[in-house]
């Protein structure tokens, strides 16, 4: 590497790995030795559509010190006895103290520290010393006997002396080893809309500077999002959980240079305050006597508290086995002769008599344990309060989720105002490291040029046209383009509130108006009232038994009436019985207000499930979709859904849907499998079982396309992949695509279709605004310039009408394109595929195949509870990923429904 003087500078060897370091584990068993395919570059921008001027929440960045270098140092942090430091949050305190103590030895350099193992400076540190001793004088040891708590049996004596000394010094060893030089010129290249091999590394450094800047302001850091301890940012979601509004902030390399992307962000936190209040809210009880302490122990573990009166912070490790009156410990003190002795005393007695603290209600309840496994340390629960800004990482309830969505909405104008204020209050101009880099950030939103694509024309029954206005249409006085028949059907009623007679009458009447022939149901099977408190699986089995006795034969369709729309524990077992065991199409409803619109929406789902179609694109019926209608083309949508937060051992569910009956692009079927928890790459696309069998997800979809399309193989494959980050693009391109190609070759070695691979991302922070308007951007808005990638082929699209809050565009990345789409043709195809979602009469925010894959994974995952699967996986079979326990397999769909749109 060259130094500033032009001489070749020899870098020292990399530092040795510390003894506690663990190698990074990838989530794929296949390794990428050398990528065979690279991400494709942009070939041009689209031109179709009505031009529109927009603003975006990217703020332009300028750089003056492009000739400087970031120096990266590996941080090895140990205690005085050489034990590694693994506690989060300690590193920043130690490095801050290091900077203060050794300022002159470190040439008064400012640091950018990531809080873990990496430290960055501008220019090199003096090579005088790389080992430092740091003493924190106010270090909180977390031993509660040092702060007036009741110590466990093994704690040393002299408690009174410890009470007078709530903090103690702690000595650390810090070792800094040079790792790399990163040129700031890489950022300068990004400013010119280019990228070098160091660009992402350099951008990572200035992102770390932003994180450090926010950490010094006392923010909670969650990746690139920052949350202040400000009650005005909190919204109560119930159950002891609060939504905390903060902001996301990250640098992005774009076509128009480097920009700072700022957006509103929300995380969930535990409601701060008395521990008892949290438990009452969390368990929805009105008195501490009703608290389930086993649940309380799980809810409180690892949360941080402050104790009164010392106001010292600890981490909860558990609860005492006995209540405060009965939990004993050995109090070490001196007797009348001055000799040390141990006296057995209860926690309650210690705090009341020895400490003189009045306890009003703690006596009958467990104590909070903040000690160690063999040395517990207890506090009465009423002396403990949860500290602010602690993330809540468990799954939210349905009510909490809906409350969060409702309370987090912001209209475009309000969001712009909030973001302007955030940038102003962040005061990045005062950050020394940014100043040393010569980085300055513009205060105004970046202007971008967008285009509004015309809504595709739709066809209903009898050749009638459907006209989408603002991304919406309706079937008033119109028939469905391919109406099915609802025959040999029955109603099962798990709800005591629903008027089944009126519901059936309305379905028959509305169905007739839409062209669906609806026969009278065989029967209405009512649940026995005595079963309503039974477990869900028993209720379903009881209903199936009753149905089989009353019906003349197996029905083709079942309408299932539930008491609740989203909280019903009947849904999963019922779907499994119908779809996996019996092969019966079923529609679940939980009607509250039954009107024509509600019945129509239900019929749209039923019609699609039974093989009908509600509407089609006009270019589908012509057929005249560029590059798709003339050559047999299959469209795949792929997604992986994971267990809820806090459920790290729940298998992930991979789903792939595929189009069928080419040249249609509106009809799909699904293939679903379970795989290792949290594994984002789909590992079951191609699974050869010997020389003749392939049990992967793709094979059955290719065979279905062949049989439904007049025995024609697809010569083109368009893949839409959801849910992967930019760092995983190469894996999708070189692992998943390889598996799909292998699945094709396994069917026919001479078959070589062309592939186009597109990733869709919703989890990003770019938003668009119409200047001077209170409204969202119009549906069909596309942006493929300015804030897009400097080299790679990507674009943003808002296909839907944002009726509530601020529209979030979908970010499409074209990784690979052998078919050869122009920018206009591909953007038009993506836009059109947002109008073929058979469940609704609106354009949706992402292409329908991805939505269907998400729905299929979500529905099949409810077939069985995974805590039950772990006990019964041997009966279902299972597969093992390398180095992990067997993953329970999901029940397979019955042959009768496998090719249906059961997920609608």
UniProtKB/Swiss-Prot annotation:
SMART domains: DUF1785, Piwi. GO terms for molecular function: RNA binding; RNA endonuclease activity. Residues 557-865 form the Piwi domain. Residues 274-388 form the PAZ domain. Gene3D superfamilies: 3.40.50.2300, paz domain (2.170.260.10), Ribonuclease H-like superfamily/Ribonuclease H (3.30.420.10). Residues 11-21 have a biased composition (Pro residues). This is Protein argonaute 4A.
């Amino acid at each position: 590497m060259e130094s500033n003087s032009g001489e070749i500078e020899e870098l020292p060897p990399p530092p040795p790995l510390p003894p506690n370091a663990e190698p990074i584990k990838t989530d794929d068993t296949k390794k990428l030795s050398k990528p065979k395919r690279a991400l494709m570059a942009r070939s041009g921008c689209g031109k179709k559509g009505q031009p529109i001027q927009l603003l975006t929440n990217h703020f332009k960045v300028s750089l003056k010190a492009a000739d400087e270098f970031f120096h990266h140092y590996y941080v090895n942090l140990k205690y005085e006895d050489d034990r590694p430091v693994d506690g989060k949050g300690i590193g920043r305190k130690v490095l801050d103290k290091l900077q203060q103590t050794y300022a002159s030895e470190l040439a008064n350099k400012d640091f950018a520290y990531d809080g873990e193992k990496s430290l960055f400076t501008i220019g090199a540190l003096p090579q005088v010393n790389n080992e430092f001793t740091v003493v924190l004088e106010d270090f909180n040891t977390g031993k509660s006997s040092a702060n007036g708590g009741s110590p466990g049996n093994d704690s040393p004596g002299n408690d009174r002396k410890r009470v007078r000394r709530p903090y103690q010094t702690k000595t650390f060893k810090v070792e800094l080893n040079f790792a790399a030089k990163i040129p700031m010129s890489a950022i300068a290249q990004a400013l010119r809309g280019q990228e070098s091999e160091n660009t992402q590394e350099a951008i990572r450094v200035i992102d770390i500077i932003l994180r450090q800047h926010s950490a010094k302001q006392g923010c909670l850091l969650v990746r690139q999002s920052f949350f202040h301890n400000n009650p005005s940012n909190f919204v109560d979601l119930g159950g002891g959980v609060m939504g905390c509004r903060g902001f996301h902030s990250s640098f992005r390399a774009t076509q128009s240079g480097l920009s700072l992307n700022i957006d509103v962000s929300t995380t969930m936190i535990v409601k701060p305050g008395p521990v008892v209040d949290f438990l009452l809210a969390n368990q929805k009880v009105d008195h501490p006597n009703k608290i389930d302490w086993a649940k309380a122990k799980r809810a409180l573990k690892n949360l941080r508290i402050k104790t009164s009166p010392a106001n010292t912070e600890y981490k909860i490790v558990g609860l005492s086995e006995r209540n405060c009156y009965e939990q004993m410990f050995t109090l070490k003190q001196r007797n009348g002769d001055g000799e040390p002795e141990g006296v057995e005393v209860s926690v309650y007695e210690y705090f009341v008599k020895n400490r003189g603290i009045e306890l009003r209600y703690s006596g009958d309840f467990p104590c909070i344990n903040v000690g160690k496994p063999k040395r517990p340390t207890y506090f009465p629960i009423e002396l403990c309060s949860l500290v602010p800004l602690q993330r809540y990482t468990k799954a939210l309830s349905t009510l909490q989720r809906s409350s969060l969505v409702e309370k987090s909405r912001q209209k475009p104008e309000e969001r712009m105002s909030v973001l302007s204020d955030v940038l102003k209050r962040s005061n990045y101009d005062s950050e020394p490291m940014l100043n040393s880099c010569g980085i300055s950030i513009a205060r105004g939103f970046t202007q971008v040029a967008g285009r509004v694509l015309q809504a595709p024309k739709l066809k209903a029954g009898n050749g009638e046209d459907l006209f989408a206005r603002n991304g919406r249409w309706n079937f008033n006085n119109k028939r469905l383009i391919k109406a099915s028949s609802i025959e040999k059907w029955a109603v099962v009623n798990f709800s005591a509130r629903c008027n089944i007679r009126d519901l059936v009458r309305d379905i028959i009447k509305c169905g007739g108006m839409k062209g669906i022939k609806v026969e009278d149901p065989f029967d209405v099977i009512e649940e026995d009232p005595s079963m309503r408190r039974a477990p869900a699986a028993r209720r379903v089995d009881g209903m199936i038994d009753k149905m089989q006795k009353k019906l003349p034969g197996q029905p083709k369709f079942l309408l299932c009436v539930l008491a609740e729309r989203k909280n019903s524990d009947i849904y999963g077992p019922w779907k499994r019985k119908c779809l996996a065991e019996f092969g019966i199409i079923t529609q679940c409803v939980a009607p509250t207000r039954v009107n024509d619109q509600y019945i129509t929406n239900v019929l749209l789902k039923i019609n699609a499930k039974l093989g009908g179609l509600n509407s089609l694109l006009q270019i589908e019926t012509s057929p005249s979709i560029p590059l798709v209608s003339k050559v047999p083309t299959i469209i795949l949508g792929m997604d992986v859904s994971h267990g809820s937060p806090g459920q790290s051992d729940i298998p992930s569910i991979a789903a792939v849907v595929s189009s069928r009956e080419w040249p249609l692009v509106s009809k799909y079927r699904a293939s679903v499998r379970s795989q290792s928890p949290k594994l984002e790459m789909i590992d079951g696309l191609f699974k050869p079982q010997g020389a003749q069998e392939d049990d992967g997800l793709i094979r059955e979809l290719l065979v279905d396309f062949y049989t439904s399309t007049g025995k024609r193989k697809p010569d083109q494959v368009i893949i839409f992949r959801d849910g992967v980050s930019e760092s995983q693009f190469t894996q999708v391109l070189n692992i998943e695509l390889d598996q799909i190609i292998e699945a094709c070759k396994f069917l026919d070695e001479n078959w070589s279709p062309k592939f186009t691979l597109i990733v869709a991302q919703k989890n990003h922070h770019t938003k668009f605004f119409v200047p001077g308007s209170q409204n969202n951007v119009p549906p069909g808005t596309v942006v493929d310039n300015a804030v897009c990638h400097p080299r790679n082929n990507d674009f943003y699209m808002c296909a839907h009408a944002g009726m509530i809050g601020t529209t979030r565009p979908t970010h499409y990345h074209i990784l690979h394109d052998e078919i050869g789409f122009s920018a206009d043709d591909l953007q038009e195809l993506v836009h059109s595929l947002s109008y073929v979602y058979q469940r609704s009469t609106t354009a949706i925010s992402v292409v329908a195949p991805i939505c269907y894959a998400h729905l299929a994974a979500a529905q099949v995952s409810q077939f069985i509870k995974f805590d039950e699967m772990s006990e019964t996986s041997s009966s279902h079979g299972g597969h093992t990923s390398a180095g992990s326990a067997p993953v329970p397999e999901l029940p397979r769909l019955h042959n009768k429904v496998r090719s249906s749109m059961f997920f609608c």
